[in-house]
Regions:
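Conserved signature/switch motifs of ABC ATPase nucleotide-binding domains
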Residues: 123, 144, 176
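Helix N-cap at the start of a conserved alpha-helix in ABC-type nucleotide-binding domains
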Residues: 160-162
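ABC ATPase "signature
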Residues: 208-209
């Protein structure tokens, strides 16, 4: 699903509502038939419910948001390590920190190789190009195994020559049947990679349909 529209049309706000970073005033959020949010129901979600709901979504920001003090591999294992610890605690079972970390390292190495960065595991963000940093951000989001991977203008902070390497990774994810929601200004990319397109204006979905309907 691609979300297109001019600046200020509400694209990023919609994405933030989906990821529970903003509180929607109307509507529902369902994932795989599971109701995560209903604005018509009184009360607010607890912090624990918000954390649980956010795990359904991975979010790749336009500005990478990598931790500068950690290398590439550590950027991709930090959140899964914490999640494994919290899950063990919630289930009332012992937490094997070493075993969990080993499994998360193996997963991260596989994902980083998938995005073409298998040789950069020990590098720090400052040693990478913008395109490489964005690919690390994609691998980091995938490490949490979200149901839906969201992108907020994933190429807007990149020089034109670095844009294609990120778009190639996203196309590869599409080929692997990864469910994605992409806010983008790359119209040709949206046309060719999307199964469904939403056009927004003034905070409202003005039009939606398959790419042929929207772009003709």
């Amino acid at each position: 699903l691609s979300i297109i529209g001019s600046s200020g049309s509400g694209k990023t706000t919609l994405l933030r509502c989906m990821n529970f970073l903003e509180h929607p005033e109307e509507g529902q959020i369902l994932v795989n038939g599971q109701l995560l949010f209903d604005a018509s129901r009184p009360g607010t979600l607890t912090d624990a419910q918000l954390r649980e709901n956010r795990l359904h979504f991975g979010l790749v920001f336009q500005s990478f948001n990598l931790f500068p003090q950690y290398n590439v591999l550590d950027n991709c294992t930090l959140a899964p390590d914490l999640l494994a610890r919290d899950k063990a605690k919630a289930e009332g079972r012992p937490f094997d920190k070493a075993a969990a970390h080993k499994a998360n390292v193996e997963k991260a190495e596989t994902l980083l190789a998938r995005v073409g960065l298998g040789a950069k595991l020990k590098n720090y963000p400052c040693e990478l190009s913008g395109g490489q940093q964005q690919r690390v951000a994609i691998a980091r989001a995938l490490a949490l195994e979200p149901d839906i991977l969201c992108f907020d203008e994933p190429t807007s902070a990149l020089d034109p020559e670095l844009t294609n390497e990120v778009l190639r990774v996203i196309k590869g994810l599409k080929s692997a049947d990864t469910t994605m929601v992409i806010v983008t200004h790359e119209m040709e990319f949206a046309r060719h990679v999307s199964d469904h397109v939403i056009f927004m204006a003034d905070g409202v979905i003005e039009e939606e349909g398959d790419p042929e309907q929207i772009f003709t």
